[in-house]
């Protein structure tokens, strides 16, 4: 309510069409800490939307930019998992209006390109997978100290205000709590969708999830929702087992507990009946382990974790020749503008519990503390509020 009143007040002051000054966490270069700066956010141009951010999650992908393992131009405002309210719209915008509660989408859905028109596709041609760091017209809406600041993954949510393309925003139910449903903007949807959309887990099946971070836990929740009868969680850190069991895992194991290959351990545990495996770590070795662990003839293995850049994978092609299916997905294979509002509605109907994934809620000014929690392994998801 407070944020909505604030939007109304700003409308009365006539911010639409004008530059807004606000606080943002700017990364001036890689491997350097965030700097909380006053930035200028330009008005939205044609088919663009300016959003007041209410809450934003800290995701491992953001940390990849800091560490230099993900391509980005600098300076940049990262962050891509958020909830906000539309402050103003550019010419030609028809799907949202000022005052609407929305989720910015790092994976756009233009509904016109081949991927958007294909029922099985979701990697929209407007996706910024190469780290261009600008909007559709090739420019940025952010300025700091007289210098242009780049966008990140079409979203840039570590700021009080951002500007996105209309194809990168989904209107959601106004009753949705922003500090919870922001996770639907990335982490939860990526894992949940990997199970229900990409993997197409069948009722009564056995699933194995490699990696029990926030996305891995979301995969477990998706497997449970799809009706899997057995869900095995795998992680080197046994401290993660309790939470995995709480969200739906039927058992958890650590590879360190056996000298046998993990695929052999799983075969013995299940009577050689693993239907689905999910690699949610991003390590080449575990991608192959996950593939080898599903049934050699009818098993499906899904790569969910972001693989390291500039690395090549070597594997025995017989793993596929016998009939296994090996798949990957971005955003769980979901069509962002279509599926995000549906997931918010399902959350409000208590189909799944996002509280299980949120371990910390901090004010935006403590963003660096949030990343310390991430890198020390103390958090699953930290949400920053404005």
UniProtKB/Swiss-Prot annotation:
Cofactor dependence: Zn(2+)
A cellular component term, taken from the record's GO annotations: cytosol
Catalyses which reaction(s): a primary alcohol + NAD(+) = an aldehyde + NADH + H(+); 10-hydroxydecanoate + NAD(+) = 10-oxodecanoate + NADH + H(+); all-trans-retinol + NAD(+) = all-trans-retinal + NADH + H(+); 9-cis-retinol + NAD(+) = 9-cis-retinal + NADH + H(+)
Binding site for Zn(2+) 2: 110, 113, 116, 124
Entry binding sites for NAD(+): 60-64, 211-216, 235, 240, 281-283, 304-306, 329-331, 381
UniProtKB keywords: Cytoplasm, Lipid metabolism, Metal-binding, NAD, Oxidoreductase, Zinc
Tissue: Preferentially expressed in stomach.
Gene Ontology MF, one: alcohol dehydrogenase (NAD+) activity
Record carries keyword Nucleus: no
Regulation of activity: Retinol oxidation is inhibited by the detergent Tween 80. Ethanol inhibits both all-trans-retinol and 9-cis-retinol oxidation. 13-cis-retinol is an effective competitive inhibitor of the 9-cis-retinol oxidation. All-trans-retinoic acid is a powerful inhibitor of all-trans-retinol oxidation. 13-cis-retinoic acid is a powerful inhibitor of all-trans-retinol oxidation. Cimetidine competitively inhibited ethanol oxidation.
GO biological process, one term: retinoic acid metabolic process
Root EC class: oxidoreductase
E.C. number(s) listed in UniProt: 1.1.1.105, 1.1.1.1, 1.1.1.66
Record note on cofactor: Binds 2 Zn(2+) ions per subunit.
Compartments where found: Cytoplasm
Similarity annotation: Belongs to the zinc-containing alcohol dehydrogenase family. Class-IV subfamily.
More info: There are 7 different ADH's isozymes in human: three belongs to class-I: alpha, beta, and gamma, one to class-II: pi, one to class-III: chi, one to class-IV: ADH7 and one to class-V: ADH6.
Subunit record text: Homodimer.
Name of this protein: All-trans-retinol dehydrogenase [NAD(+)] ADH7
Organism expressing this protein natively: Homo sapiens
